[in-house]
A protein has these predicted regions:
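Conserved ABC transporter NBD signature motif
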Residues: 57-65, 72-73
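Conserved ABC ATPase "signature" region
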Residues: 97, 101, 108-126
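Conserved ABC ATPase signature
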Residues: 130-134
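Conserved catalytic motifs of ABC-family nucleotide-binding domains
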Residues: 151
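Catalytic Walker B motif of ABC-type/P-loop ATPase nucleotide-binding domains
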Residues: 155-158
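ABC transporter nucleotide-binding domain
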Residues: 174-263
Length: 317
């Protein structure tokens, strides 16, 4: 395992940001941490990258203890932070050259490495322009280039597409997948975009209030609990007849609407409607990771976002 944690915990005065987390990530995996702001995703990445020290528990990255061997951990990883961290007053090439020096990339191959990553993220033509002239997407691509230029075994990506438009987000992920394949890297990313995790990750962990709620491949999670999702509104609310149906895997009631998880809903829809009584409407769709999140947390991820992040929860204590 290239990443391993045992009982990893981070506490602040009034709140537990990460709660006894056990995690194992294999070499070459693209692993996603999925959850709302304040769930503990950034806290976990910060500890694995040795930026924060755990309150208790242990963790190893590339076989190195994050507390006892932080320098070895840092030398073996790359990271793209949630907030921009490139120097606006330098050119793209100068930012990469400075990173080469900091990570001790041999002088003989520095130029080659810079040219390689600039080509990979399609920034060759803008490499000698100041970063303050770059678009948001270009800056993100530059940060990706910087993160992998020293050939890390693990690449940490903390909300790498946060705030970007959908087209730019798609391009960024194309680069990430290509980088992972070309460099044979393990990628650990955080996101609250469900579709990103579903399309990109070999496995995901849903994290909420500092705990891992469930962990598996996206498809396995959907298959285990969802199937199709039937959303309906009864004219006369009465859920007991529906609750007795053996083909209804899960049922959530929210704001007068029922959300039912049913495998092969088209086969059961006619029978289902004989048990619902009169309805205002019914909708059938394929299940998504948002439905998985709803199943395990009782909230949709956008509702969890609206509750506020970590420090908002601290202030409520």
């Amino acid at each position: 395992m290239v990443i391993k944690t045992e009982g990893l915990t981070k506490k602040y005065a009034k709140l537990t940001a990460l709660d006894s987390l056990d995690l194992h990530i294999k070499e070459g995996e693209i692993f996603g941490l999925l959850g709302p702001n304040g769930a503990g995703k950034t806290t976990l990445i910060s500890m694995l990258c040795t930026i924060l020290k755990p309150t208790s528990g242990k963790a190893w990255v590339n076989g190195f203890d994050i507390v006892k061997e932080p320098a070895k951990v840092r030398k073996s990883i790359g990271i793209v932070f949630q907030q921009p961290s490139v120097d606006d007053l330098l050119t793209g090439r100068e930012n990469l050259a400075m990173h080469n020096l900091l990570f001790g990339v041999p002088r003989a191959i520095r130029k080659q490495r810079i040219d390689e990553v600039l080509s990979l993220v399609n920034l060759e033509k803008r490499a000698d322009d100041l970063v303050n002239t770059y678009s948001g997407g270009m800056r993100r691509r530059l940060e990706l280039a910087r993160g992998i230029m020293h050939h890390p075994r693990i690449l940490f990506l903390d909300e790498p597409t946060l705030g970007l438009d959908p087209q730019t987000r798609e391009h960024i992920w194309e680069y990430i997948v290509e980088l992972a394949r070309k460099e044979s890297m393990t990628v650990m990313l955080t996101t609250h975009y469900m579709e990103e995790a579903e399309q990109l990750c070999d496995r995901i962990a849903i994290i909420d209030y500092g705990k891992i709620v469930v962990m598996d491949s996206p498809q396995t999670l959907k298959n285990q609990i969802i199937g199709d999702v039937v959303k309906l509104k009864q004219m006369i609310p009465d859920i007991e007849p529906i609750r007795q149906l053996d083909y209804v895997k899960n049922m959530q009631e929210k704001e007068g609407l029922l959300y039912l998880s049913i495998k092969d809903a088209s086969k059961h829809l006619q029978d289902l409607l004989t048990h619902t009584g009169p309805i205002d409407f019914v909708e059938v769709r394929s299940g998504t990771l948002n439905d998985v999140f709803l199943h395990y947390t009782g909230r949709e991820i956008r509702e969890a976002e609206a509750e506020g992040g970590f420090w908002e929860r601290v202030m409520k204590k």
